[in-house]
A protein has these predicted regions:
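N-terminal ordered "arm"
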Residues: 1-45
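Generic ordered-secondary-structure signal
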Residues: 14-16, 27, 98, 123, ...
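Alpha-helix initiation and N-capping motif
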Residues: 28-31, 133, 162
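Residues in flexible loops and secondary-structure boundaries
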Residues: 30-32, 58, 168
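Mixed-charge (acidic/basic) macromolecular-recognition segments
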Residues: 35-152
Length: 177
């Protein structure tokens, strides 16, 4: 399991301002030990902040302030198991969710949504070397995904607007780069 981030924890209920730094995700025992070190037993009394992301730093602006330290640990545990392709999918899914929230004026992304996105990365198609609408359009045409274009003579392919085809396909599938 790879490490996702460094997190600083301190008890907001204790007069002792000493905190503890942990590398997440952590085990249940590491969490219990940290709670002992900051002199608290209640997760509601724990103030925490991410000091440094080792990966998934694009999540930082989307972390819900009401997320408990246990929810955050669970999220980082899910994230730590993702491979490079799945991490790319997670980034794309997050972009799509952010765009949906903006369109629908839904406010910030919730902890539950982040957990759902992380668990759905295997249901995404990640295309290597496709970084633009034009690349996507070429991919669709060259791989026969646009059956309406199969009847065209080879000489007509040079006249196609691949960027427009790619944009149409990306938008119809709610995709992201």
């Amino acid at each position: 399991m790879r490490k996702v981030c460094e997190v600083y924890l301190v008890s907001s209920a204790s007069s002792d301002e000493r905190g503890v730094e942990l590398t997440f995700p952590v085990s249940q025992y590491e969490m219990m030990d940290a709670f002992e070190q900051i002199h608290t037993k209640s997760p509601g009394d724990v103030y925490w902040q991410v000091d440094e992301f080792y990966c998934f730093d694009y999540l930082a602006p989307h972390l819900d302030e009401s997320m408990s330290i246990f929810e955050f640990n669970s999220l980082t545990e899910q994230l730590s198991k993702l491979d490079e392709r799945q991490e790319t999918a997670m980034n794309g899914l997050l972009q799509m969710q952010v765009n949906k929230h903006i369109r629908e004026n839904n406010g910030p992304i919730t902890t539950q949504e982040l957990m759902m996105l992380a668990s759905n990365v295997d249901h995404c198609q990640v295309l290597a070397d496709v970084h633009s609408n034009e690349d996507l359009g070429k991919f669709y045409v060259e791989n026969g995904f646009r059956e309406d274009l199969d009847a065209l003579p080879d000489s007509a392919y040079a006249l196609l607007d691949y960027a427009k085809i790619g944009k149409q396909m990306r938008e119809s599938e709610a995709g992201a780069f």
